[in-house]
């Protein structure tokens, strides 16, 4: 994907667009990097803690979650809350059932604030995620467009 320079998921038209010229670089760029595991980690500001967190953009994921890594870093934010839900998560190693706490979550990306009204926070997991949040396809599709610029390493939603 990197040789393409820039791609745009246009959800209004249900198209993947590779523009002839790059979108001008915004002031917040760069806001993502490629991890040693070859994942693209997007830098978000977490509305709960106010800190920067790493999100993995996964167009194949069926939903957005806050990972066990996030939970461990922010356990004090969930004092008095009990994991009342569970989630079946499938991956290369098979299927795991993990305990979750459903929350409303606010984050800032590219200077804009967004809210997910009901996403799970994984409180126990056998996986060692390298990121705090996984952004899945439903979150991406909630916006008109999602632009990824590989040349200057930035991502953003357009509404």
Where are these regions (language model features)?
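Pepsin/retropepsin-fold aspartyl endopeptidases
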Residues: 1-159
